[in-house]
Amino acid sequence: MVFEGLSDKLQNTLSKLTGKGKLTEKDIDAAMREVKLALLEADVNFKVVKNFVKGVKERALGKDVLESLTPGQQVIKIVNEELTNLMGTNEVKIDFSKKPTIIMMCGLQGAGKTTTSGKIANKLKKDGKRPLLVACDVYRPAAIKQLQVVGESVDTPVFTMGDKISPVDISKAALEHAKKNGNDVVIIDTAGRLHVDENLMEELQNINKEVDPSEILLVLDAMTGQDAVNVAESFDKSLKLTGVVLTKLDGDARGGAALSIRAVTDVPIKYIASGEKMDNIEVFHPDRMASRILGMGDVLSLIEKAQSAVDEEKAKELEEKLRKSTFTFEDFLDQMQQMKNMGPLEDLLGMIPGVNSKALKGINLSENEFAKVEAIILSMTKKERIKPEIIDSSRRKRIAEGSGTSPSEVNKLIKQFKDMRKMMKQFGNMSKKMGKKRFKMPFPF
């Protein structure tokens, strides 16, 4: 879960305040000391932490808070607002005013630049754009091949001229190619280095002068913490960045980069990415991220993920089947696939208000559990999936052997499935009687 350590500490500290009827200056001082320590441990820039704590404390000591009937909730509201301000207040969108829109991707080696280029292409393609990926890393062995593989995985063309032509000339030729072939977005994957150096910056500056990109996005590894902010400062000084993409937010990222970059460089975070799957990228919303960190959920992002993963026609069919109790294991398997497309279950549950990382630790969210359920269903015959009532003890034994599980695990899944089907039928009938629009669930559990 994103920023798990920081999130736990902030939530624990602020929960102490909500348990008190009245707050004193001493209470707020103690809480702010803990908040300060939590932010520093998350590798947030020291000056940023100092200003943040000062701003929260000044507002928290105001008359409106101290005399409020719910002062603890008021302080949480202030922390939420200040966290949002720290990360940029509002989302900053990609500038598509120029045709074609040129996005120059830059960053150090290992940050995930090539994969991120593919993820952005994939996202823009889903938004109705016609992106072109451009291979300008002519130095790293197999870099061009890697981009071609990425492009193929997201069904996006890759422009390449091999590794003997200069990146500047490749960029110019790619722009002409895009104009002739109707590509409205050109994503230039430039070369990275192990560290910031003059040659890297000079090459990027030359590409910038020649093709005049609408966006210069710096890809940063969130796990590098404060170093990421230093890298952002160096690149911004030479190139005037328009945005940052933070990657590897599913790792042990402590959150320092996300909470420091905007405040230190004034460069907005435009996307955040996690994992290797091409769908694992989302537009960065400072207000939603602040809410996630404080355990207040992110319902809007959850809805957006569900809408992008769910087939509308299938959702209508599913709703009818659930109401009539004709929902089968075939449908269940289909819903599992759609849910997997929404991203890791732990991340999805983390977007629900009130579900914090401590609560998630008590739940088995292993991908292996999904795989086990999938294996059991796939080991059934088509007839068994449609009519689970016919699955007797000998069939259960065969299914267990075919899926590498035990008969008791097969029994458990069938029982849970039948219980769920009954419950969903009752839910569907109840909502129909109430005459309200039924909730279209993206998955059946």
Write out the residue ranges for each language-model feature:
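Short, surface-exposed connector motifs at secondary-structure boundaries
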Residues: 127-132, 154-158, 184-186, 211-216, ...
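Long amphipathic alpha-helical segments used for membrane anchoring, targeting, substrate engagement
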Residues: 3-20, 288-445
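Primarily NTPase-proximal linker/entry elements flanking Walker-type ATP/GTP-binding cores
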Residues: 6, 10-136, 143-163, 167-190
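Residue-level signature of catalytic and energy-coupling elements of molecular machines
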Residues: 17, 43, 79, 108, ...
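G-domain G4 guanine-recognition motif of GTPases
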Residues: 45, 109, 134-139, 161-163, ...
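Conserved phosphate-handling catalytic cores of large alpha/beta enzymes
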Residues: 171-174, 179, 183, 195, ...
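Short, glycine/polar-rich helix-capping loops at beta-to-alpha or helix-loop-helix junctions
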Residues: 141-147, 228, 256
